[in-house]
Amino acid sequence: MEKKLLSILLVLSLMLALVPAAFAVEPASGTCGAEGDGSNVTWTLDASGTLTFTGTGAIRDYASSAPPWRYSAVTVVVGEGITRLGAYMLAGSTVTSVSLPSTLTDVDTQALNGCRYLTGITFPDGVKTIGEQALSNCTSLTSVTLPASVETIGDRAFMGCTMLASVTIPEGPTHLGTNLFRGDWELKSILLPQSLTQLDESVFSSCGIETITIPDNVTVIGNKAFFASGLTDISIPAGVTDIGDRAFSQTRLTSVTVPATIRSFGKYIFSECVDLHTAVLAEGITRVSDGMFRDCTNLADVTLPQTLTAIAQQAFSGCTDLEHIALPETTVKYGACAFSGTYLTDVRFPAGTSYLGKGVLSNMPVLQQITLPDGLTSVGAELFLGDKELKEVTLPSGLTAVSDSMFSGCTALQSIDLPDTVAYIGESAFSGCTALTDITFPAGLEGFGKKAMYYCISLPEITVPAGVRTLAEGVFNGCSKASSITLPNGLTSIGYSAFAYCGNVQEIDIPDSVESIGGLAFSGMYLLSDIRVGAGNPTYHTVDGVLMTKDGYELTAYPASRPGIRYDVPDGIVEIAPGAFYGSGLVAVRCPDSLRKIGERAFEGNINLRYLQLPAGIQSIAQDAMLSQCDITDVYYGGTEEQMRKLEEPYSIFFNGTTIHYNSYMVIPSAAELFTDVDADSWAIPGIDFCVLAGLMSGVGGNAFAPKGVTTRAQVVQILYNLSGCPKAYDGSPFTDLTADWYQHSIVWAYQNGIVSGTSATTFEPEAPVTREQIAVILMGYAEKVLGLDFSADKADLTAFPDGASVSDWARDAVAEAVALGLISGAQTKDGTFLQPQGGATREQAATILTSFYSLVDLDLRLMLKDSVL
């Protein structure tokens, strides 16, 4: 009951809002004529709110000042003899009714604009002109009758009359003002006079009109004439010659026939008519105009005339129900994005096609094959952009270039034949063609645009034709499966990030002709171990596989997989190029006193880097030189704290959380120098050196490492715990034999993360020697549970080892994975190579296995950690 009462009160309040409030009116009077001193017309306002005009001639305009009766008048009586209502004379007033004289001829601009309580009005015979916005925004007005005498109806005369449902327009006017009924949503139908010759701009825009008959004499339908109206059906007369921009856009039309008489088409005439299903263009029409049917998402049936010569840009763009269309043989020109976003499955361009604009067939979700007609020598950019199902393409035999982004994002395209005539492959031409494996560049190819083959991750190899002189920025960036790169003699420059993330390439030869190499050219090539430059190159050379300028000024590129964990930048180097050490596995880098500049992203992705030496004379470090994916713990800086502060001033800080040793030089001895029981020639030196330098292992006391000593289960877990940064572990282990403090946290952490289990329900046996199969289980568990790496797809055949059957069932998968990864290789004996799964591991063996494991997961982690290809 309470809810019902509230509803009634709400309705009453809304109704009352439409009625002017009753209040006492103070009588007043005055003159308001437009002639001489204004005395030709007088006005009188009585106590009841009745406003009476008497006199002869015109009432004055009130354009710049409000009339004195604006908020008092309720009923208006205009006396006989008055010929004109002045501009703004009743605008915004509270009047509810207006009585007009038979002598009236003109209603001026906004004379009754905004009379929101006025519900109806009758204009007497004799009225010739209804001025601009004369009754606009009269939101209670429901009907208007115009007399036969009306000759002119001004722009926006009835705009915003949201309750207007009935209008009678007499014969006589040749056109209706612009925006005449705009926003009149209750106006569902109207009878137009046969005298009309044109429908002006936005005359029925955003109007509720549903059905209408356009008079036969109309030749022009203006811009937005029916835009966003409720129109459901239209017959365009044969006499119409001009249709303006968006004339029927966003209406509710379901079908349309465009007559042959149309000679001038505007843009987007039927765009966004989401109910439009059928469109017929009559014979004689020569062009589908710009965006004519754009985003008509229900359009499925289109008939084009045999006289058609061109389909303009975006003509059918976004018509997602359009699956078939027959193109006339006469249609030879297609504008930008003409069919973009449609669901056409088969497009057959006529043999005489002479022009395909930008993106004509772009973003078509189901297009799988296409043949472009011979005769085309060039096509627009982005022609097939984003066509994710496109698999087969036949290009015209005379094509001279693959246009910019022509096949960008065509993720199903596996192979393509380029005509011998192709001399240039444009910017991003094949970018993101992730399935492309088979493409042969023509012998006559002269160049590539930026990122031409960007992220073609399935390309098996890269061979640059002999005629190419420059490689643009990012041209083969992200071709991660390419195992080789072949560059021609004659190549003079390699652009910025040209081969970035070609992660399967292990070596590269730089031709003698190369004069410049851009920053990050070889960044992200995580398997690259050697860069070679011919002795005849005047600009570059390599020292131990590291690329530098021949004058010794710049270190250009350090191969990410070059052996070793320390590197001393050669004396004399002044600059480290952008991305020079990108993704390396180095732990310590020493820079010479000659160094002055470190370029952008120089040490990005160096997740192993812990120690860095910088000279006092360094002048510039790029803000992002080493912040990303670096975990430098110690910087040895030859200068003072004040010098470092000035160096950092342009930015914020280079070494957040890093210990900076001022006025210092880095001295980190090798394992052989640290430990008296480690032979400098030992096979285990690389493993011991890495584990000690990376903080994974330490000595056993004094100057001893005990390389032949036993490795315990707790020690292996502790090493992995250190590798993970000693994360916090919570109580919850079932093991009762964890007596020593140094390993309690690490074992609890490993158990909680599913890396290890006990030797029984309550014991872990931390001091027991770790077996080879236990190491395998622990390492594979760590890779999966902590790092998220899955090596299960590649398992070795353990039956190849004489003792393969002796591997415990619980360890069999992990051992098979470890052998396949090269972490466990077996022990050589006179009787063959044995796994010895239950055998122990010495500390030097453990260091070697852990170093191999770290190198393996480090590569995978660097691949995972990269934000994106450059």
Regions found by a protein language model. Give the residues of each.
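Bacterial N-terminal signal peptides that target proteins for export
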Residues: 1-9
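Bacterial N-terminal signal peptides
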Residues: 9-17
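Sec-dependent signal peptide cleavage junction
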Residues: 16-28
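Surface-exposed repetitive/solenoidal architectures
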Residues: 25-94, 113, 203, 225, ...
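Structural signature of tandem-repeat unit edges
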Residues: 50-56, 71-84, 93-106, 116-129, ...
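Consensus positions within tandem repeat domains that build extended binding/scaffold surfaces
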Residues: 86-89, 109-111, 131-134, 154-157, ...
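Feature responds to low-complexity, polar/acidic, surface-exposed segments characteristic
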Residues: 669-685, 693, 698-745, 753-773, ...
